[in-house]
C-alpha cells in the first residue's frame, strides 16, 4: 500500500499519555505559504509512524493530498531546492533556528521512488532517500530535537514515562553551545537512534544505564581541537548516527555537536593502552559486519562521509601522531588491565538482553503503529468513498428520482391498463355467457335440426370464447392441454416432480441470424385480398361449409431466391480432371455447376435442415417423455391431492359466482318489478292526492274569498253592485264601540243560522261531493267576521268609562258609507294630500272602523308615510283618539318619521324611543299605563322605535294597549318563524297597518306571512296552502305552462280587501321618468386569472350533489363560493391588496429593550445608521489633531494662520491689486463685476456661505429685459456693459411676465392655473423605476464627546436648516408676530431643489399605483369613464354596493380622483345618518353618495341625486328597487337614470337573470299579468341551493348537468341524492335562509352583527350605545351564546373550500 500517513488531529488509537507536539516556529527565513500544512505525494508507510505528538500537531493535522510530487507549492510558496544529499545522508540535522527538521520516512531507495518535492516539515533540503543497497526493509526513525520527550523502556519491556511528559510542550529554543546529551536509559527511543547498538555488531561504544539513572546529563565540551588519530581508531564507527549537514549549511550554521551521552561518565579515564588492547581483542570478522544501527542506518562497506572535509597538513598530522604516541605510551587504565574481560562479557550479555528487549518493545510499537496507520488509512478511504458516494448522489440523484417517478407513473398506467383489460374481459365473459344461454335457450326451443345445430355451434363458440377469456383473466399462457404437445395422454391423476419440460419452448427452427429481419410490408391489394379471404372463410363457417385451404407456400422461397442470386459465385468452377479440355466443354460444365448451386443445393439444404430440425424436435420430445417416465417412481408426492383440491376449489368458486350472479339477476328483476308496481301505486296516489289538494285549496280559497266578500261588501256598500260583484250583498253597519252586544247582520244571501263551524283537521277532502266543504267554508268565514267584530268591540269596551261622557265625539255608531260620503283631509295636517293619497286615507279609515287590518303597498316614493300620519291626525281630530300610536320602522328612517310627524302634525307629540338601556329606561317613565285614554295634553301620542328595540323591550310593549300599530318596511317580518314576527303578533293593539313598497320580495310565502300577520285566524299558516304556493305554481313555471287563470283570479280577489297598491306611473304624472340601463363590463387579465383559478379548484358536480342532499354546511360553503366569485367580479384587491414597496435598507435601526423606559415620545428620526462606519481615533477628531484649529494642544495653528493664510495667500488685496495692475492672473475681475475685497472675501468663504450670499442678491434689472426687449434693434438687444462682460447668466435669465412677481398676492393672481394645477396634485408623476436597495450616508464614529458635539452642531445648525428648507423656527415666527415685522425677508425660497419624483418626495417608498388600481377591475374602469361623463354633465350620483369592503376601496378611488363624497352604511351611527343625508341634500358640491344596498335603500329621501349606479346588483330585485326609489320619489323633478354594472360571462349575469324572474312574479301576482314562463322561486331549499350551484357553471357545464339530471329523472332517481343520505337526515341547527347567508356582514341597518370596517374611513372605538344596532352581542366561547369564534381544530375539506382566497366567511 502506498500513500502518505494520515495526519489527523486526533488518532483514535493514540494514547492520552503521549505529550502534545509543539508546532514549529514560523520565525525563520523560509516557511512555505505560511500555511498550516503542506501537501505530500503518496508514499509507502514507514515501519513505524511519526511520533504521536507529531500527529497531534495542529500544523500537520490534515489528510494527505492526492496531488503528484511534481506540483508546485501552494499559494506561491518557495519551491524545494534542487540539491539532493548523498544516499547515505538519510536524516537531516536540526537547524540553528530551533525548528525541528522532520522528514517523511520512505522505505524505498532513491532509485525506486523519487523525492516528493518540498519537505513536509519545512526543510531546506527535500530529499528523503535511503541507501540504495540496503538489505533490510525497515526505515529509520527520524532524529529528535532537544526538547522532544523521550520514551524509556522499563525493566519488563513496557514503555515507561519520561519526565518531559509532565510538562507542557514548549517551543524550540535557540541552539546553545551545549552538546546533545545521550539518555541515561540506553533503551530509550533517543538512545536507540543515537548510537550503534545493533546486536550483530560487537564493536560498540559501551554505556552503563544502571550507573546513571534518570535523565541524561550533558557534558560541556572542550574547545574543538583535533588530535592525530591512528588508523585503527578511524575504523571504529562514530558514536552517533546523525548525518552531517551539507557544506552549504556548515557555512551558515555550526554543525550539530556530537552528544557524549553514549559514553559513561567515569571518574577515572582508562589508559590508551588498555583501550587499544581491548580493541585488538575483538574478532577481525567484525570489520566485515555492517557498521549500522539496528534499523539499518549505515551500509556495511560505507561510512557516513562528510562532504568537503578539510585535508590535514603535515604539521597537523605530526601533531596528531604525536598525541597518539603520547596516548599509547601512557599508563594503562583500570579498564585495560587484565581481568576486565569478565566484566566486559557480562556487559555484552546485558547489552544483548537490552537489545532484545528494545527489539521486542519496538515490535510492539511497530504493530501498534501499523494498526493505527491501517485504521487511519481505512478511515481515509472510507471518507473518500463517502465523498465519492455523495458526489455520485449529487450528480445522479435527480435523474434517478425522475427515472423512479417515471417508472412509477408507467407502472400506474400499466396497472390501469390491466384493470381496464380485466374489466373488458369480464364484460366479454358476461356477454358471451348471455349469448351462450340465449343460444341454448333458442336451441331448446328450435324445431328444426339445422337451426338447433346452428344455435349449439353458437353456444359452443361462446363457450370457447368464455374459456379463452377466463384463461386470459387467470394469466395462463401455457398450452391448454399436454396432449396437444406430446403423443401421450395427460396424466391427470398424478403429478411430476420435474419441471424440465415446463415453461420451455421448442428450439427455433430458424437460425438466429435471420431472427432480426423485419417482415416485408404488404401492399394495399394484398391486405384487401386477405380481408376478402377472411370474410369468405367466416361466411363458409357460418354455412357449415368446408373451408377452401390454399396450398402451403414456403415463406422463405422468395428470400432464398434473392439470397441465391446475390450469393451467386462469380469465380469460375475448378475444371475437373478430364481428358477433354475444349473451351465449350468447360463452359457447359461450369454452367451445370452453376445451375446445381443455384437451384438444387439450396433446396437440398432446406430439406436437410428441415429433416434435422424435425428429428431433433422428436428426439427432444422423446427425451422429455423418457425423462418423465424414468422419474415416475419419484412421483409419490401430494401434488395430485393438491391438484384435486385446487380443481375442487375452482369448481366451488365458479359455482358460487354463478349462483351469486343468478341471484343478483333474479333480485334485480324482482326489484324492477317491485319498483314498477311502486311507481304505478305512486302515480295513483299522486292523482288522488292532487284531487285532495285541489279540494283543500278550493276550500281555503272559498273560505278566504267569502271573508273578502264580506269585508269588501261592508266597505263598498252599494257601490259593489255596480262592479258586478253580486255574490254577497253589502251591509252598511259598523262596529259601535259603545254597545258590547251589537252585531252585524250578515246578508241573507249567505246567512245560514244552522251552519256549524268545522275544524280544518276534521274535514273530509276525499269525498267527491264538495257541498259539505262549501258549507264549512261559509261557516268559517262567518265565524271569522264575528271574531274580528268581537275583538274590536272588546278593545273598545275595555276603555275607561270616562270616555262614555264624550260619546258624541267618538262617533262610531253612525258610520258613513264609502259610496255616499268621502272623508276629507284633517285640518291639523299641514300638508296638502294628493288625490290618490286622499283615497288611501279613506281606505285606511274604513279598515279601522271595521276593525280590520290592512297592507298599504303603494310603490316606494308615493307617500305611504304621509298617509299613515293623516290617519292618526284623522283619529285625533274627528274621534278624539290621541293614541297611543306605535310606529316601528328601520333604524335608518327613525329620524325621518320623527321629523315628518313633527312637521306635518305639530299637535301630535312624538316620543323617540331609542338609545342605550339607561336612556330607554328614562323614556319608559312617559308611558302612563294608569290612564288608558290619551288626550291632547298627554306626554306623548306616538312612540317611534325600531324593530331591534321592540324585540329587546317586548315585555314592556306588551303591557300597553296600542290604538294603532304601524309597521314601516313590513318586509322585515316576512318570516313567520322569526322571533320578531311572534313578538309583534303578541302586542295588544286594536288595528295593525303594514307599510311596504314590495309585498313580494322573494316568493309568495312572504306575502302569505304578511296576510297571516294581519288576520291570524283567517289566513292561518296551513301547510297545504303553503305547499300549494311552493309546488303548484312552480310546477307550472317549470313546465312553461300558464297558471290556472281561475286560481290566479281568485287569489287577486283574496288580496283586494286587505291590500292597496298604486304604481307611480298611474297616479303621479308630474314625476319624472326612470330609465334603467345595464352596462356590461369585461374581466381584466388579473380578474380572469382569479376567476379561472377559483373555478378550477371547485368541482361543480360535487356542489350539485351536495346541494341535492341539502346539508347546512354545504349550503354555507356554496354561498361562500358565490361571494368569492362576486369578489373577483368587483375587484381583485378584495382578495389581496397591492403592497407598499420600498428598497432594501442597508442600515441599523433603533432598538430598545422596552418602551417603558423610553418615555412618552420616542424620537427615531435620526436613529438609522449605515452599516459602514469609519472609526476615527479620538485625537484626530479633537482640536489637538487638526492643525488649523487653535487650542491648548495645537501649537501650529497660529503659524498656519499667520503664514499660510496671510503671508503666502495669493488672494490678499495687495497681491490682487498688483496682479490687476500688471495684467496678471486676476485681471479678469474687471470683466466679472467683482471688486478686490469681494474676491478676497470669497476666497475665505465656503461653498455654502457663497450660495447663501448669492441667494440674497436681487437681479431686478434682468426683469426689465422683457419690457425693453427689441428684436429689431440688434444693437440694443445685444448691448452688454464692459464691467459685466463675463456675467452671462445674470441678465439673460429671461422669464415670463407672470413669473416676475415671485411673492405676494400679485403672483397668486397671475398664476391661478398653475396654483390650481399644483394644489390638485395633477403634476404628480409616478416614478418608472426604483432602486433595489438604499442606505443612510456613511458616518464617522468617534468615541469622544467633542466629535459628537461638533457633528450635532453641524447637522442641526438652525441657520443652515433655515437656509436649506426656508422654514423659520418657532422662536423666529413668535418674534415676527410680536414685533409685527414683514415676513417676506424671512421667507426666502428654499435652496434645496424640488424632488425628482413629486409623488415620492425625497423617499423611494412606492405606494401602489392608483392607475393600476383602476385598470385591474373592469367594473371600476367602466365606472371611471362613467363618473367622468356624469361629473361633466352636472349630475349627482348614488353609488350602491353589496360589500362594505368594496366601499372602502371606492373611497380610495374617489380620493384619487378628487371627487367629494359621503358614505352611509350599516356601521354609520344613528346620529350621523341624519346629518349625512342632510349634507348630501343641501350641499351640491358633494358628487357621490356611497351607500350599502341593504342599509341605504330604506326610507331615506335622496332626491338631490338624479343618477343611481349599482356597482353590484342584489339577487332580490325589490332591494334594488327600494334603493333606486331613494332618488325616484316625490320631489324629484329630473329624469332618474339607473346604471347597473354587470360583468359579462360571469355569475353576475345569472344573478341578474334570476332577479328578472322575481320581478315577473311581482308583476303576475300584484298586477294580474300573464303568468307564462314564470319561475316563482318558491321551491324547496334543496332546489334553490342547486340553482345557486348552477350559477357557478358555465354554459357547457350547465348543459351537461341538465342532461344528467334528465337521465336521472328518467331512471326515477333524484340527481345527486344518492350520496350523503345520512347528512340529509341530520337536524339543522338553525333555519338560516340563503338570503341571510348571502347578505351576512353587508352592513344592513337591521343586522345587529354589522360592524364598522374602518379600512378606509376611521371609526371611533367607543361602543355605539346610541344606536339601535348596538345590541349586545353574546360572548364567544363555550356556553356563551352563538358567537362565532375561530376554531383551532384542523380544517376539513369543506371548510377549506370556503377559505379559497384566504379571506373566508361571507364578510365583505
Curated annotation (Swiss-Prot):
What stretch or stretches form a coiled coil here? 395-478, 634-706
Signal sequence coordinates? none
Q: Where in the cell is it found?
A: Nucleus
State the GO CC annotations.
chromosome, centromeric region; chromosome, telomeric region; Ino80 complex
- The residue ranges of the Helicase ATP-binding domain are 845-1017
Please note every region of biased composition (Basic and acidic residues). 265-285, 408-417, 426-463, 523-534, 551-571, 632-646, 1692-1701
Mark out the compositionally biased spans (Basic residues). 507-522, 1675-1691
Q: Which reaction does it catalyse?
A: ATP + H2O = ADP + phosphate + H(+)
Position of motif DEAQ box?
A: 968-971
Q: Low complexity bias: where?
A: 108-122, 211-220
Compositional bias annotation for Polar residues = 24-37, 88-102, 1658-1672
Q: What is this protein called?
A: Chromatin-remodeling ATPase INO80
Which source organism does the UniProt entry give?
Aspergillus fumigatus (strain ATCC MYA-4609 / CBS 101355 / FGSC A1100 / Af293) (Neosartorya fumigata)
